[in-house]
Amino acid sequence: GEPYIIYIDTVNRQIPQHHKLAGLTVKTSNLCSEITLPTGIDKEGRDRTAVCCLSSLNVEKYDEWKDDELFVGDVMRFLDNVLTDFIENAPEEFSDATYSALKERSVGLGVMGLHSYFQKKMIPLESVMSKVWNKQIFENIQKKVDQSSKDLAEERGPCPDAADYGIMERFSNKTAIAPTASISIICGGTSPGVEPIAANSYTHKTLSGSFNVRNKYLMKLLDKY
């Protein structure tokens, strides 16, 4: 494992306006720190429990979907459907979690493959160009995520927490950068989350066994020269 550091005061300054108005606060994150949702007793006397409903875009394939006006919106719709399925089918023992999910409709769209994308484009990780691309990628995602929340609020109704204050948002929380250590393997061994690739050659230990993983973009470069 590896440690993650989170500044809870910064988190609470950035929570949705309707949660600030409701007097809700974030007291802790999940282990990997991408989930920062309010917990504890709310104004209705109910106990809130954070619920993770996540998906991650493969940024290594960014050029294939960056101009698609439906792609991000479709993923957000998928997350909304998953949340509804959980609310409707979770056992009674999960009543606090289903209550929180129903009121907040918090989801988290993240990414993986950022370093792989930079390597594919021959962009040094510590460079001005990587900063430019990083800003462009996440601004593009955020713009489409925000629009999707408003569109779904018009179509399906705003989440109750937002509706209480006349705010048209389907989701309270919209984005979350998860480590994606496992699903990045499924997606062709792309780099996990927004983290750099650990090494150009290393042993990957999984339940299926141990495997040598080599940097595919370095291999292509070595083959070329």
Where are these regions (language model features)?
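Long, C-terminal-biased catalytic regions of enzyme "large/alpha" subunits
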Residues: 2-225
